[in-house]
């Protein structure tokens, strides 16, 4: 029999009281006997007492074992002092007022006097790293503080999930998807799920993951673009998707993921593309406000690890044209020709220009030339520019979209002009022969959006199990 098994047998059996989560403990529960569970974050002791800081989700409460109680014998008391950190335990005890506020706990005014204790999940091996040693790169701190490398944290992601900052980021991710979904459902959008195994790419280019599909070549979808459009042509009017997207980008791993979550929107075009930009801006305002109103605790925890600056925005969008943006860059002596796409550095400089001028961190660039947009972008017959738009947050593109070309002949010619083979897009093109409504849409990279929102330098913080050219596990 193992030492932990012996300890479990000797410690009193827990009665089946209703389990209470630490987050639901309140000051007015003084004197109540409760049952709670959590991970042991720390243990300190003196000759007659053991103090256990118990953690569950984002909450922490101090629990006390008195040597004089019947929790354990003298021998067992000494062993309880040595319980491994991160052991998952269940305790029963009485809630009492703390004489002095317990600063290291989130429940600072109460503590639990333990009467029974059970080790539900023992730690049987040395931890890969100590959670107290983790911090996000960029946080100013004592240079003597040990920092756990992020790759080590990712290798042991299950343990990294226990960090309050990681859980806070995960809750922010969840809140983003929830608000995105709620906003669109309120506006009568239908959620769809498109295939991720495709016959050919929607964007052209070589950034595709190939696979063997029953002895036939296939690829992982780099966008749900074509399927979204087919849904609109099919009369669904307004659709959205939250789903994985795959890009075989061999580039800066801090900015790109090989697998990321796309937030995609497509709808019949009812007014103008400028009106759709206002609709999207309102969506982002809803997300930003939901962070401020519903994620206060999570934002504060993240600040303890990374001191980000609050995003500045207005209720109405700031919109500049592609030409305006190029002129702004030229005014700063940046070498760029009209017709060139913006680099990451160009976006960063434009973000600074707009911030200095408007004191705003989010703006929209519209009317790109067709040479740097996808084949399905609608070209205005007067301006000869696409009715397109990119949203920039803190100098980083987080959304790209356009009105779509819905006329078959124009669309087929655009495919050819881009050097693509119409045969590879035959099923897609065929749909436009049978009455395709004018439509419009966009795609948002969830992880990149949140990276830009917080101003972090590594996109991997916003993916549960990030995939990049150097990582395919866990």
From Swiss-Prot:
UniProt: ATP binding residues: 247-249, 255-257, 397, 445-448
Localization of this protein: Cytoplasm
Family (UniProt): Belongs to the class-II aminoacyl-tRNA synthetase family. Type 2 subfamily.
Record-linked PROSITE patterns: AA_TRNA_LIGASE_II
Reactions it catalyzes: tRNA(Asp) + L-aspartate + ATP = L-aspartyl-tRNA(Asp) + AMP + diphosphate
Metal-binding as UniProt keyword: no
Pfam families (alphabetical): tRNA-synt_2
Molecular functions per Gene Ontology: aspartate-tRNA ligase activity; ATP binding; RNA binding
SUPFAM superfamilies: Class II aaRS and biotin synthetases, Nucleic acid-binding proteins
Keyword field contains Aminoacyl-tRNA synthetase: yes
GO CC list: aminoacyl-tRNA synthetase multienzyme complex; cytosol
Location of the region described as Aspartate in the Swiss-Prot/TrEMBL record: 225-228
Positions contributing to L-aspartate binding: 203, 247, 400, 404
Keywords of this entry: Aminoacyl-tRNA synthetase, ATP-binding, Cytoplasm, Ligase, Nucleotide-binding, Protein biosynthesis
InterPro entries named in the record: Aa-tRNA-synt_II, aa-tRNA-synth_II, aa-tRNA-synth_II/BPL/LPL, Asp-tRNA_synthase_2, Asp/Asn-tRNA-synth_IIb, NA-bd_OB-fold
Protein name: Probable aspartate--tRNA ligase, cytoplasmic
Main location: cytoplasm
A single GO BP: aspartyl-tRNA aminoacylation
């Amino acid at each position: 029999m193992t030492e932990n098994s012996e300890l479990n047998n000797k410690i009193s059996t827990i009665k089946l009281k209703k389990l209470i989560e630490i987050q639901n403990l309140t000051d007015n529960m003084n004197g109540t006997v409760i049952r709670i569970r959590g991970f042991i974050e720390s243990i300190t002791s003196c000759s007659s007492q053991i103090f256990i800081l118990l953690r569950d989700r984002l909450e922490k409460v101090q629990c006390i074992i008195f040597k004089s109680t019947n929790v354990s014998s003298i021998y067992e008391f000494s062993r309880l002092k040595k319980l491994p950190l991160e052991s998952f335990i269940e305790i029963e005890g009485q809630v009492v007022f703390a004489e002095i506020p317990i600063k290291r706990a989130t429940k600072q005014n109460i503590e639990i006097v333990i009467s029974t204790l059970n080790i539900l999940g023992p730690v049987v091996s040395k931890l890969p790293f100590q959670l107290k040693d983790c911090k996000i790169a960029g946080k100013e701190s004592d240079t003597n503080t040990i920092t756990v490398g992020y790759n080590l944290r990712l290798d042991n992601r299950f343990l990294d999930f226990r960090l309050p900052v990681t859980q806070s980021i995960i809750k922010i991710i969840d809140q983003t998807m929830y608000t995105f979904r709620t906003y669109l459902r309120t506006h009568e959008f239908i959620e769809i799920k498109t295939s991720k195994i495709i016959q050919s790419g929607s964007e052209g280019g070589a950034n595709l993951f190939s696979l063997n599909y029953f002895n036939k070549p296939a690829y992982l979808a780099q966008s749900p673009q074509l399927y979204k459009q087919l849904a609109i042509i099919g009369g669904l009017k307004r659709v959205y998707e939250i789903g994985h997207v795959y890009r075989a980008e061999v580039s800066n791993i801090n900015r790109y993921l090989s697998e990321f979550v796309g937030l995609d929107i497509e709808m019949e075009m009812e007014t103008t593309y400028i009106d759709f930009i206002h609709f999207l801006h309102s969506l982002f305002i809803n997300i930003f406000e939901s962070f401020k109103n519903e994620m206060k605790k999570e934002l504060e925890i993240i600040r303890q690890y990374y001191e980000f600056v609050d995003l500045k925005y207005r209720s109405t969008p700031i919109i500049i044209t592609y030409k305006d943006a190029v002129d702004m860059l030229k005014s700063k002596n940046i070498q760029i020709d009209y017709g060139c796409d913006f680099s990451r550095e160009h976006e960063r400089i434009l973000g600074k220009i707009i911030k200095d001028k408007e004191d705003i961190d989010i703006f929209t660039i519209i009317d790109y030339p067709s040479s740097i947009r996808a084949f399905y972008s609608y070209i205005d017959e007067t301006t000869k520019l696409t009715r397109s738009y990119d949203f920039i947050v803190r100098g980083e593109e987080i959304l790209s979209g356009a009105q779509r070309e819905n006329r078959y002949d124009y669309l087929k010619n655009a495919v050819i002009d881009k050097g693509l083979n119409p045969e590879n897009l035959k099923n897609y093109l065929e749909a436009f022969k049978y009455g395709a409504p004018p439509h419009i849409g966009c795609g948002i990279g969830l992880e990149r959006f949140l990276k830009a929102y917080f101003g972090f330098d590594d996109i991997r913080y916003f993916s549960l199990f990030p995939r990049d050219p150097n990582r395919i596990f866990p």
